[in-house]
Structures are given as structure tokens and as C-alpha cells.
A protein has these predicted regions:
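Conserved acidic residues
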Residues: 45, 111-112, 149
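A short SAM/SAH-binding and catalytic strip from SAM-dependent methyltransferases
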Residues: 111-129
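A conserved mid-domain beta-alpha-beta active-site/ligand-binding segment of alpha/beta enzyme cores
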Residues: 164-234
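Class I SAM-dependent methyltransferase Rossmann-like catalytic core
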Residues: 1-45, 49, 54-56
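A short glycine-rich, Lys/Arg-flanked "PGG" loop and its adjoining helix->strand segment in the class I
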Residues: 121, 129-148
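Class I SAM-dependent methyltransferase SAM/SAH-binding core
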Residues: 48, 53-106
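Conserved Class I S-adenosyl-L-methionine
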Residues: 210-271
Length: 271
């Protein structure tokens, strides 16, 4: 008797599935702006929306936004809950598909992008490095003229006003981005509640991320006179002051969007 082949179990656990239209718009726009050239260079750029949740909105929107910079991009939504995959199937079309799976990333290609938003919040901090390594190992490798695929892992509030994410390449973590709707912000440290799992428990004295948010609040307070020109101008002035002491990697074009990106090494946990 021939043994019946078994399908490996997906790696990971079911998330709450909370999602909303446009929840991940800030992350999508950042990806399109900073990773668009890599996507255009790829022969078959596949992006994975990992853990898209109870409805397929974020995968649908990711495809639309990526195609503004890479018209041949494709998106595969991956969910560990079979019922969510079945519910998303009617939304499939050219360039958009849905698959049952988890951190193993059940696509034949090495993806140019893996987006994992609000997935790791339910995991222990000690599990993050292993998940990152597994996902980075699935990315398209670096090559001549290419830095390889990109993993974007982070957390946001329910309607996407406040978001913090880590960007990683095949080699590991690169940067941390803080993004917000500026009108919703009282002070930059309000973003602390949306730190990704690798950092949220490190927002304590003695840790780099705590020092960064402390300095950001001080720069924000010092920039108070710019508030008369609007929250955007105040944010931009505060970020400009931050660059004196912190390795900010972006510039005014991204700051105007309510963003600031810092090298991972500057914020990485100690010990």
C-alpha cells in the first residue's frame, strides 16, 4: 500500500483577524516609495501579505499601491485560518491570489516583499528572532545591483493612524520607521504603544528605544513655536533636530508624510 502524502502543517498560530480598509496605507505607501525600484527590477515581483486577517482588504489595497510603482507586481495573501482563505477566494483576480499557510510562506518563488502587520503582537518577544530568521530566509536573495527582498514587520492601531515597523533584508534587520497621522499626535512617544514586539517591552530606561522616544519628545517640545504653521512643520523641525544625535536615514520628503526612519542598530535591544 502506498502511503498517502500529507501536507505539512502551517507554521504559526491564528491571529485575532482584526482588519479594516486602509488600515495599512502608511506602510503600503512607504514600501512603494522605498522599495519600488527593487520591485521594478525583479523579473517576477511577488509580494506576500502574511496574516491579512478576517477580510482581504489589505491584500487588495497592497496590490493597487504596488502597481503604481511596479505594474507587473503580484500579491499573494497568506492566512493560517482556512476559513479566512475561503472567504477571500472570491476576490482573486489577475495578480492577486490567496493561500493557506503561515511563516513557511507557501509560494514557490522567493518573494520580493513579505508584509507582516499586526501578526507578532500575540507572540513572546523571545520568539521574534526565530520568526524573523525564517521569513528573511524566504526572501529573494541580494544580487548584483539588488539588496534582495524586503520583510516589513510592525504594528498599528485599528484604523492605521499610528504605526511602527521594522524593515529587514535577507541579512537581517535594517531600519525602524515611525509613522503617524500628525493631527492625532500629542507627543511622539504616543507611538510607543505601537512598537513591534521586538521593541515594545524595551521601552524602559536604559534601553535605546526609550532614549530615542525621550529625545524625540524633547525635540517636539522645543519645536512648539512651529505649531503655528501646523503639525507637519513642527514634526519636520523636531525630526531635523533629532538628526544631530540619531542616525535618521530618510529626509524631508518622508518627514512630510509624518514619518521618520532610524537605523535598527541604534534602537536594537541591549542584551
Amino acid at each position: 500500500m502506498t502511503a498517502r502524502a500529507t501536507t505539512p502543517r502551517p507554521v504559526g498560530t491564528v491571529t485575532r483577524g482584526t482588519t479594516n480598509p486602509n488600515r495599512l496605507r502608511r506602510m503600503d505607501r512607504w514600501i512603494a516609495a522605498t522599495h519600488g525600484a527593487e520591485l521594478r527590477r525583479a523579473v517576477d515581483p511577488v509580494a506576500v501579505d502574511l496574516g491579512y486577517g478576517a477580510a482581504p482588504w489589505t491584500a487588495v489595497e497592497l496590490l493597487a499601491r504596488l502597481r503604481t510603482v511596479a505594474p507587473h507586481a503580484r500579491v499573494v495573501g497568506v492566512e493560517i485560518e482556512p476559513a479566512r482563505v475561503a472567504a477571500a477566494k472570491p476576490y482573486e483576480r489577475e495578480g492577486l491570489a490567496f493561500r493557506h499557510g503561515g511563516f513557511e510562506i507557501p509560494v514557490p518563488q522567493r518573494p520580493s516583499l513579505i508584509r507582516a502587520a499586526n501578526v507578532l503582537r500575540q507572540y513572546d518577544e523571545a520568539q521574534v528572532a526565530e520568526v524573523w530568521a525564517r521569513l528573511c530566509g524566504r526572501l529573494a536573495p541580494a544580487g548584483e545591483g539588488s539588496r534582495g527582498g524586503l520583510l516589513v514587520e510592525g504594528t498599528c492601531d485599528e484604523i492605521g493612524r499610528r504605526h511602527v515597523w521594522v524593515a529587514l533584508g535577507p541579512e537581517g534587520p535594517r531600519t525602524v520607521t515611525f509613522a503617524t497621522r500628525l493631527g492625532s499626535l500629542e507627543r511622539p512617544s504616543d507611538l510607543a504603544e505601537r512598537l513591534p514586539k521586538a521593541l515594545i517591552h524595551r521601552n524602559v530606561p536604559g534601553e535605546p528605544v526609550h532614549a530615542f522616544l525621550r529625545d524625540f519628545d524633547r525635540a517636539w517640545a522645543a519645536a512648539a513655536p512651529y505649531a503655528s504653521y501646523g503639525a507637519r512643520q513642527r514634526w519636520m523641525r523636531a525630526v531635523r533636530d533629532l538628526t544631530a544625535d540619531w542616525p535618521v536615514t530618510d529626509g524631508p520628503v518622508r518627514w512630510r508624510q509624518g514619518e521618520v526612519t532610524v537605523t535598527w542598530g541604534a534602537l536594537a535591544p541591549r542584551g
